Amino acid sequence: MRLADVAERFGATLDCPEHGDRPVLGVAPLETATATDISFLANPKYTALLQTTQAAAVFVRPDFQGEAACPLLRVPHPYLAFAKCIEWFYPQPKPVAKIHPTAILGADVVLGAEVTIGAYTVIGDRVRIGDRTVIDSHCTLYDDVVIGSDCRIYSHCALRERVQLGDRVILQNSVVLGSDGFGYVPLPDGRHYKIPQVGTVVIGNDVEIGAGTTIDRATLGETTVANGTKIDNLTMVAHNCTIGENAILCAQVGLAGSTHIGNHVVLAGQVGAAGHLTIGDRTVVSAKSGISSSVPPDSRMGGIPAMDQTLYLKVSAAVKQLPDLLKRVRKLEAKVGE
């Protein structure tokens, strides 16, 4: 592969066409790239690395003006170009469509074309699986599960009764969809009476769910995740939550029951949301924040309890001054007491 081929494939402008015959064998970060690797610059904080990188060339924005030790490939979206370059150089192996002899299929299962089912996977009755979907080993699909086309379900996932997946859904290892919601009636004698959880979970198209994440079935109706949303590892979504389109939930987010997340919302790592509230479209919440009330669209929030991000930064700065302020207050109290 030549550098000129990379430029042509990704519609990039090569700053130094005379280097077009330079060989390209892979992709790598700026700091570890070798003379045959393509790299990228998307975050300005790493601009200085352009002067020391050994990369064959680097994807940058068209308006980039800095110095570089290698040729530059100018594209509108360097990070996206880099991602597609990875796909090009490291294509994913296509599984051989087959049903492993140790897999167990229930009655009236409907399989689409080129479906793959791995070893020791158990498929319940009346399950429907779309074309080209791959289900790895040791997965369990309970009765009446519906899975769309081109999905990838990695090992040890469990999909409970009536769970539905759209097309091109990715479930990383040990995802659990449709476990019972956490619902109990407190009794006068202190015991807790379990409320039957008879709803389900519905996942839209192009959703990816990270390893160890759990999404509980609705008490009645549906817990839903809309098209294009990405959920990181070890996230908890409780019963009757709804998550809009193209949202991002980072690792260890926890949503209590009946939390409603809008479209294009970003919840950073370990954000927690109390139940029965709404987080409006395009809202961004910083890491470890606690959301205790509904948030309007286009908000920027942080802190516990979550507040406007600008106020949160001021409060955080003020907290660092508290020890000195406390000393000053004590001195003033001592003077007043004299």
UniProtKB/Swiss-Prot annotation:
Residue stretches spanning the membrane: none
Active site residues according to the UniProt entry: H239 (proton acceptor)
Pathway entry: Bacterial outer membrane biogenesis; LPS lipid A biosynthesis
Assembly and interaction partners: Homotrimer.
EC number: 2.3.1.191
Gene Ontology CC entries for this record: carboxysome; membrane
Family: Belongs to the transferase hexapeptide repeat family. LpxD subfamily.
Coiled coil location: none
GO biological process terms, semicolon-separated: lipid A biosynthetic process
HAMAP family: LpxD
Domain of life: Bacteria
EC top class, as a word: transferase
Protein name (database record): UDP-3-O-acylglucosamine N-acyltransferase
Molecular function terms, GO-annotated: N-acyltransferase activity; structural constituent of carboxysome shell
Protein role: Catalyzes the N-acylation of UDP-3-O-acylglucosamine using 3-hydroxyacyl-ACP as the acyl donor. Is involved in the biosynthesis of lipid A, a phosphorylated glycolipid that anchors the lipopolysaccharide to the outer membrane of the cell.
Keywords in alphabetical order: Acyltransferase, Lipid A biosynthesis, Lipid biosynthesis, Lipid metabolism, Repeat, Transferase
Classification via InterPro entries: Hexapep, LpxD, Trimer_LpxA-like_sf, UDP_GlcNAc_AcTrfase_non-rep
PANTHER family linked to this entry: UDP-3-O-ACYLGLUCOSAMINE N-ACYLTRANSFERASE, UDP-3-O-ACYLGLUCOSAMINE N-ACYLTRANSFERASE 1, MITOCHONDRIAL-RELATED
NCBIfam families: lipid_A_lpxD (TIGR01853), PRK00892.1 (NF002060)
Catalyzed reaction equations: a UDP-3-O-[(3R)-3-hydroxyacyl]-alpha-D-glucosamine + a (3R)-hydroxyacyl-[ACP] = a UDP-2-N,3-O-bis[(3R)-3-hydroxyacyl]-alpha-D-glucosamine + holo-[ACP] + H(+)
